[in-house]
Curated annotation (Swiss-Prot):
Its EC number is 2.3.1.74. The active site is at 167. Keywords: Acyltransferase, Flavonoid biosynthesis, Transferase. It comes from Zea mays. It catalyses: (E)-4-coumaroyl-CoA + 3 malonyl-CoA + 3 H(+) = 2',4,4',6'-tetrahydroxychalcone + 3 CO2 + 4 CoA. This is Chalcone synthase WHP1. Pfam families: Chal_sti_synt_C (PF02797), Chal_sti_synt_N (PF00195).
Amino acid sequence: MAGATVTVDEVRKGQRATGPATVLAIGTATPANCVYQADYPDYYFRITKSDHLTDLKEKFKRMCDKSMIRKRYMHLTEEFLSENPSMCAYMAPSLDARQDVVVTEVPKLGKAAAQEAIKEWGQPKSRITHLVFCTTSGVDMPGADYQLTKALGLRVVNRLMMYQQGCFAGGTVLRVAKDVAENNRGARVMVVCSEITAVTFRGPSESHVDSLVGQALFGDGAAAGRGGADPDGRVERPLFQLVSAAQTILPDSEGAIDGHLREVGLAFHLLKDVPGLISKNIERALEDAFEPLGISDWNSIFWVAHPGGPAILDQVEAKVGLDKARMRATRHVLSEYGNMSSACVLFILDEMRKRPAEDGQSTTGEGLDWGVLFGFGPGLTVETVVLHSVPITTGAPTAA
């Protein structure tokens, strides 16, 4: 038998991309049903038949007033909830009804976002080689990744399904996409985060007031991104480069955020001072990510931070001395969509890359070169992604 003509090292080098992973397109989608935060307390207590809990309703109104949210989108309509009263109780068996919603609607909303990203990318969907799908909404087999693959008509694609990750996972899908793109020459990775609050919606409880926080903050939405290394400058225009990515669990944070899937749905609880834990550790995360780059001025980078709530953003700003402008895109998404869990950071990236062109800035990162993306969620887990913007261009794509 003849000996091999190439070595393993040569094969490995041939499998790897030359340049860093890039974000090539972003698409977003929401349900049609829009709810305004100013009206939501009255609606929420009426639909859950809880108007008699007057003190709790006043507390919920104050939560909504302080949320910095103007509106949210929700698949669950008043008509649907009226027909499914078990979902309006605090602790009533309702998992079947919730599952019936999410196993259909999560991939459907993800498909709408994916189609927008494919349209912007402008390349045949047959070029998609990998799919990473993430949702905190329900579990099914075959999963939402399979359903989306079939719905889009993708033939040969390597799939990864991530269930029950929570709000940090928008950073996770980018970290995974980066690893896939840079280690598989020519790979084009589609990431999709699709979140529906049907698994978490429930009525109020006087004995579990912390559960009202999620009811005041969470909304539905899906975001999709197209990623790949070594973009073809003739037909692809990068939006951001993914420079590095890391995940960490914050010290002394066990139980800070947890969620448990039960017959009553997915019950979330906030058990500690989440804003304080994040702000206490944020500078260390920044130093670990940017010290190799010689960057220590946190106002010199653009920010994409998961908007877990206004208190988190306020305390992070105060801790590192951020100018208000740095969180503009993050606060805009919180205001217009609420907390959409894993999908949020992709919505923020989408908002950020659109605004510089409108404002006459020179890069996709608000005129700045380097940036950071943070995902915060159960664990308490933090995803940190270092980004590099690209120059704003017009006309046809050019070589990166």
